[in-house]
Amino acid sequence: MSMKIGAKAFKERIGEGLEDTVMRGAVSSAQERLYERRLSASEELGNWEKWRELGEEIRQHTLAHLDDYLYQLSESVSARGGHVFFAKTKEEASAYIQHVAQKKEAKKIVKSKSMVTEEIEMNQALEEIGCEVVESDLGEYILQVDDHEPPSHIVAPALHMTKEQIREVFHEKLGYEMSETPEDMTSFVRAILREKFLEADMGVTGCNFAVANTGSICLVTNEGNADLVTAIPKTHIAVMGMERMVPTMEELDVLVGLLCRSAVGQKLTSYISVVGPKGEEEVDGPEEFHLVIVDNGRSNILGTAFQPVLQCIRCAACINVCPVYRHVGGHSYGSIYPGPIGAVLSPLLGGYDDYQELPFASSLCAACTDACPVKIPLHELLIKHRQVIVEKEGRAPKAEMMAMKMFGMGASTPGMYQFGTKAAPLLMNRMASNGQISKGIGPLKNWTDIRDLPAPSKERFRDWFKKRQKEEQ
């Protein structure tokens, strides 16, 4: 699965999302639950803003010295007997993983949840050479069983599905006959996955954070599946975006605390594992360890106005407060990275041809910026995207550009402005009934197709104000 989801146009995806009342109910319920948990967890910590500032400082420092820390990480992993591969593109990353699988004659592969492996289309690449790839994260496994449905959330992939829908998928695809309770369904999947773990020739994980000075990677899960992915198969491949770094364990401690509280509202998730190449005296762990460090456009973001987006720790706090995501769901974004973070990141990694609409899918309420634990100014970056799209890319709709040009001319000419402010209310009120415009024309049509527009006042404010002044004199 690549970054791009489906081939439908943006407006069509939005329309489908708005009409899917079941999905909207599931998303709304999950957002409210995660929001309350995050508030509670952050309040327990105390001085939350100070922790956010510290998280921002760590991420900014790491990005400012990223080349040094990447070199240190590579040296640390190699010194411990691991293998490091720097992939400039997603094709290079997938090809390397294919090469390792073929070299090790791996046919059965288990993996934990990883957005970057989705980004590089790793599953498809491995399936092309005859490998069976099984998702071990429960949410990802549900989607894989459901005809490879794409994820709609970066932390909870199946957030858009109800338990009734999940039970139906298991019944149709796996012959499941038990109840729709989470306990029964989880127990059913656990039994299947245990066999897959024991049969696996190779395990693949993502990487929440890599620790430069130790050559370790940190994996954060609620299910413990990543531990089994790294411990049972003889070969472990970890795939990370090049920015997912911390200098030392001290910084890791801070960011893991911020991640867990912001993602699921817990002090710590159930399983936090720090792994890497197996030591000579260690009993557990893989015989061979590979770390694939993926660029895929990230280096092009460094040193630009959009660099702060690389501070992201993939907690999804911004998604969990976004009113647009709440109403249209994750699939409407057409990217594996949905929500505010996706609206900023997707155009940078995937290009404006596919994602030019996303920066406009925002009310600019800045709730995302307030929620971000590392203080990424998401709403400001969305505005910057809009500026680039209109001024540098020249991609704004022609009708919109013409309208803004005409408005600029009118607003800068007092006579034309006076005439416009008198004429516009007269024209709009001709379309009104009982103070509401229900059938607009031109630029008003898209609005009135789905909601009424209050008719403007027949009297301009400046005229009313002048009358008021005269009455008071």
UniProtKB/Swiss-Prot annotation:
Residues where [4Fe-4S] cluster 2 binds: C322, C365, C368
Keyword Signal listed? The answer is no
Biological process (GO) annotations held by this record are: lactate metabolic process
State any single GO MF term: 4 iron, 4 sulfur cluster binding
4Fe-4S listed as a keyword: yes
Q: Which InterPro entries match?
A: 4Fe4S_Fe-S-bd (IPR017896), 4Fe4S_Fe_S_CS (IPR017900), FTHF_cligase-like_sf (IPR024185), Helical_ferredxn (IPR009051), LUD_dom (IPR003741), LutB (IPR022825), LutB/LldF (IPR004452), LutB_C (IPR024569)
Q: Which SUPFAM superfamilies match?
A: alpha-helical ferredoxin, NagB/RpiA/CoA transferase-like
Q: Which NCBIfam families match?
A: LutB/LldF family L-lactate oxidation iron-sulfur protein
Known function: Is involved in L-lactate degradation and allows cells to grow with lactate as the sole carbon source. Has probably a role as an electron transporter during oxidation of L-lactate.
Q: Which family does it belong to?
A: Belongs to the LutB/YkgF family.
Q: Which HAMAP family does the entry mention? A: LutB (MF_02103)
Write down what this protein is called. Answer: Lactate utilization protein B
Organism of this sequence: Bacillus pumilus (strain SAFR-032)
